[in-house]
Every structure is written in C-alpha cells, then in structure tokens.
Amino acid sequence: MFCIACGLNISEIPFAPVPGNHETYNLNWKVRLPEAYLKYFAVPDNGSANFGRYYYSYDYGDVHFIVLNSQWDETEEFKPGLRDEQVAWLRQDAAASRKKWKIVLIHKDVLQYRIHNRPERQEGISEVGEAFMPLFDELGIDLVFTAHLHTYRNRGHIKNFRRDSKGPLYILTGVAGNVRYPGLWIDHELDEVVAPQPETDNYLTMQVTNKEITVKCFLPDGQEIDKMTLTKA
C-alpha cells in the first residue's frame, strides 16, 4: 500500500526513510524484525554485522543527516543490542563528519507526555530522550526531528534536559494521514508551539544556506503556523 501510494513521488524525489514501530509489526500486529523495511529501502550501509541498514547517515550539501532507529524495545527479543550499538556508532559517525550542520531524524519522541483520560504518567523525558539527548548535546547536533505521537510540537532548544539556547532544536513533526488523537496529549512544559487544535495534517519545509537553516510548518491549506531559524557563522 505504501509503495503504491508513494511510488510516483519516490521515483522522482530522493526519499530517506526513518524506521518506526510499524516497521516491526506483521499484518497480524505481531512484533517482528523490520523485514519489509529492509527489503524495500536501499539505505546506506552502516558497517554493522548485526544491524546493517537499521540506522544510517548520509550527506546532502553541507548537512550531515543521521537517521536513528528507536525500535530497540521491539527488536530486543529477536536481536538484542540495537540501542547500545547505535550509541557507539553515533559518537563515531557524528565526530567524523566535517559538514557544517548535523541533523538527526528518529521516530519515537524524546519527551514523555501526560495523557488525558488515560492512566496517569509523569511528564518528563522518554526512554529515547534519556538514551540520546545527552549525546546530541555532546556531539553538537543542530536539529532533531521526531515523530510517533501524531501531533506537531516545537520545543525550541534543549540542553541537559532543560530549555537552553545552546542546545539542539527539537521538532515533533506532526500529523500525516487519518490517524489523529484529538485532545490526547497534555501540553509539556518544554512545548513552545503547538498546532491549532483539533489537529489536522501538516507538512514541513526546510531551507539550508551557508549560514542558516529555516524550518517552516504549514497546514494543508498553506497557512504557516510556525517558523524557526538556526544561524551559524
């Protein structure tokens, strides 16, 4: 279904997939290894003997893109060690890049939200955030795009798990498709911009120059709801 729906665009526009939880489900919603993802997406090799192409990086212009895999809870029973292997690889990969900008894409989000009308849980940092946010600080990552929660949130810059202009910019990319959770997430103290409620689809654009990255968020009708600019001399 995905290939049919996106086939024309993928054939004409470069496509960089980010593996998520649905890549580790079969048609009966049973957890498995990401077999279809690995079959259909010829992403760059990462040099791993155990997790080849589960995560990867590539360069486009003066940007080094790092695509991480947040699905270690799903893969652990079949093939343990995905999180720890990525932590070691990320240090080496990011440190080796000489590109001006470093951008991370990862499916599961770095923050944990309280939820309306669900069992209470504490607002804070997610397991993914605990694993990677200190590394993003250490390695000078400029921008982090996340997903999974089907909502658009701009968190601004975060460092040491707190708002800090010296940290990476964190963007939860939003909604695409017909799965929406109106009124589910209770706003996090680190949210700076939230999409108009109840949410509809949205899309993002990104423009990179020698000195700036500009990210904009739009609703399907073209209304701009957010704009962020990163600068670097």
What are these regions (language model features)?
Residues T146, N154, K227-T229:
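Residue-level detector of high-confidence beta-strand sites
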Residues S97-I115:
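Short acidic, glycine-rich surface-loop motifs adjacent to enzyme active sites
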Residues Q112, H116-E123, Y170, P220-A233:
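A short, hydrophobic/aromatic-rich structural module that often spans a beta strand
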Residues G20, D93-A94, L105-K108, L135-L149:
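Conserved beta-strand->loop/alpha-helix structural units within folded catalytic cores of enzymes
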Residues L190-A233:
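A short C-terminal boundary segment appended to hydrolase-like catalytic domains
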Residues M1-R98, R118-F132, L143, N154-P198, ...:
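Extended active-site neighborhood of metal-dependent phosphoesterases/phosphodiesterases
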Residues S70, H150, F218:
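Acidic carboxylate-rich catalytic motifs and surrounding loops in phosphoryl-/glycosyl-chemistry enzymes
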